[in-house]
Regions:
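N-terminal Rossmann-like dinucleotide-binding module
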Residues: 1-50
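Short beta->alpha connector loops
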Residues: 12-14, 75-77, 98-99, 125-127
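Short active-site oxyanion
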Residues: 30-34, 68-70, 119, 208
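Beta-loop-alpha module in the N-terminal Rossmann-like domain of NAD(P)-dependent dehydrogenases
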Residues: 45, 50-111
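Extended amphipathic secondary-structure runs
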Residues: 87, 136-137, 143-146, 151, ...
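A contiguous active-site-proximal alpha/beta segment in oxidoreductase catalytic domains
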Residues: 99-173, 179-183
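Rossmann-like dinucleotide-binding domain that binds NAD(P)(H)
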Residues: 169-215
Length: 215
């Protein structure tokens, strides 16, 4: 069986904890050909740890390669990169949140339809061993009469402490400021000029808590 050649954009916590280890474990099916991060050291370290032959710092460098698919798990917004990946004729796996507005999702849908490739949202929790265990436990119950689910959101540091997550400080100030400005502009287009509390709620619901929000 031909392995799927993949490029991974974003070498932060979610890539180090979930995506790159899982792709490495499934190496009979997937070939991670290149990783990308705005931090040169993060990209180089991920390439070394997960035996990836190439690393770059600009996602645009992936578009003219012979990749079959691109996994986007970098800092939001991801819409520009996602549309470019689809327009390059590649399959797309995009981490949550896909985008912040209906206009953006309409543009993504149109790009996917025009490309004829697969675009998938990254609900990796569906395949989390803990979730699969809970699913099996529920199946064994003869008759379910009541279900209550509480979503607790403590400081991520408590959860991430158990993993070997590498963080680097070599991203230029210009790149950091540009990324923050792009994200702020995308959020503003989605919800307008709102109070800090509303913006914080929006960030929570479109970030970690998105596992529990459906539309």
């Amino acid at each position: 069986m031909k392995r799927v050649r993949i490029g991974v954009v974003g070498c932060g916590a979610i890539a180090q904890v979930h995506h790159l280890p899982n792709l490495a474990a499934l190496d009979e099916q997937f070939d991670v050909a290149v990783v990308c991060d705005v931090s040169p050291r993060a990209a180089a370290d991920a390439a070394r740890r997960f035996h990836v032959p190439r690393h770059v710092t600009d996602w645009r460098d992936l578009l003219d390669t012979d990749l079959d698919a691109v996994l986007l798990c970098h800092t939001d917004p991801k819409t520009e990169a996602a549309i470019a990946v689809l327009q390059a004729g590649k399959h797309l796996f995009i981490e949550k949140p896909l985008c912040f507005s209906l206009d953006e999702i309409d543009a993504l849908i149109a790009a996917q339809a025009a490309a004829g490739t697969v675009a998938q949202a990254g609900y990796m929790k569906v395949y989390d061993p803990a979730f699969e265990l809970a699913q099996r436990a529920v199946r064994d119950i003869d008759r379910v009469r009541f279900v209550q689910v509480n979503h607790l959101h403590p400081d991520n540091a408590l959860h991430l402490r158990q993993f070997d997550i590498r963080r680097f400080d070599d991203v230029s100030v210009q790149v950091v400021e540009r990324t923050r400005a792009e994200r702020s502009a995308a959020v503003r287009r989605a919800i307008g000029d709102v109070s800090p509390m509303v913006q914080r709620t929006f960030n929570l619901l479109s970030g970690s808590a998105i596992h529990d929000l459906y539309g």
